[in-house]
Amino acid sequence: MKSHCRIALIAAAGCLALPASYAATPSNTSSDTSEIKQQLSQLKAQISALETRLAQQEQEQAELTAQQAQLSTIRAAEQVENASKDGITVGGAIRTNYSHTSYSDGNKNRGGDFDFDIFRLNLHGSIGDVLLNAEIRFFDYMTAVKYAYVGYQFSEDWQVQAGITQVPFGNWPYNSHNYFFSTNYYLGLEDDYDLGILFKRQLSDNWQLDLAFFKNDELGGVDGYVGSRADRYSYDIVGARLDGDGVFDDPAQPLGEYNTFSGRFGYHLTQGELKTELGISALAGSLHNGQTKAGNYNAWALHSNSYFHNWNLQLQYSEYQYDIDGVERMAVGAYAFYDSIAAQATSATVNLAYSLPVEWGPVTGLQFYNNYGLVYDKSDNSRDTMMNVTGVSVAAGGFFTYFDLVHAKNQPFVGGSASGDSTETERRFNINIGYYF
């Protein structure tokens, strides 16, 4: 472009007309030649200025082109990065279980039983700004969705989740370290999931807050379209126990939770190497019999979760009440069978654990623990429920194994019922082996 402009300028200069007096009067040759030289000098100066301006324009154009190329590269990189973040990751686990118990003569005579536990699938990821989390569990005797929700991070601190999501209550996310959870789990007060919407404020300025509204339980409430209301992962109220009902019977009077509000507040303290969360939780909702409102229910808890070096101490005090006229015992359902709990009771749990990193071949971590739980002051006048679990969990690559020795009274899965009246302490030695992918 620069050479073309130079040729055009020189051509223009060459086409300048000589003064008419130059040809007519030879005597004026000297003065006319001087004038022409002056004009040529001015023209050269103009050409030089134009060339300088042209060079500047070319440099500006080159810089603009480079900036546009850089911007395109950045945008392409952002698109690749966003595309890499999008998508759903599939994981899961396969678990087997060995148990040796004091309450089954057949089990003792066989030297214990080794059974298939579960196969589960987990979905986790995002598409655009929408998060997705789900887990479905396949047992020999049932299939259950543990959780399934979509989420959105609508501010730096706040996230909303909608679907089957965890009820914010007590020490989070678990109030236990062992395979059997704590006594609260069998009351529906630990690792419980219902269908609704949850707002989570992440830890900031030393405090966090969870607020939730659950329309009903994860199976659709009292009239959900399911084969059995006991086919679920977490314990929920499924009925009222009437006179003549057995502890493990299908409930003669079905009930379902609905319109439940739940909140959990945690404040985090740090004192040297000691880190503690102090919290309070509460929930309140209604019970429906399929035709009309049958009553109300509520629960609250004080809890703490402390870490000091490799030690972890969890404490929790809880109370709950199901307020239905003339009813002192409720039916609950989970894991394909029904059980009973008192309509009102108090619970206390104490959990201590020690985590030990190791390098023993594939074994990378051990956690030793003792978890103790007690349910007392029961409205149905049944005896206390007690469970103590002493054990160790072992992490080795994709394998995670629990070794638990359980001693319990009136405890589900340990030879009793949460509304039982036994004075015997039962024992269960349990090994749960899981491969996680």
Where are these regions (language model features)?
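N-terminal periplasmic/intermembrane-space "pro-region" immediately following the signal or transit peptide
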Residues: Y22-R95, F437
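Outer membrane beta-barrel
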Residues: Q79-G221, Y225, G266-G272, T349-N351, ...
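Gram-negative bacterial Sec-dependent N-terminal signal peptides
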Residues: M1-Y22
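Residue-level detector of the transmembrane beta-barrel scaffold of outer-membrane proteins
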Residues: T89-A93, L131-N133, Q159-Q161, Q208-D210, ...
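Extracellular loop and loop/strand-boundary signature of outer-membrane beta-barrel proteins
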Residues: D105-N109, E135-I136, F180-Y185, V247-P251, ...
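Outer-membrane beta-barrel "beta-signal"
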Residues: V350, T423-F437
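Signature for the C-terminal beta-barrel architecture of outer-membrane proteins
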Residues: M142, Q153-V160, E190-V350, Y354-V358, ...
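Outer-membrane beta-barrel pore domains and translocons
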Residues: R95-S99, R137-F139, T165-V167, F214-N216, ...
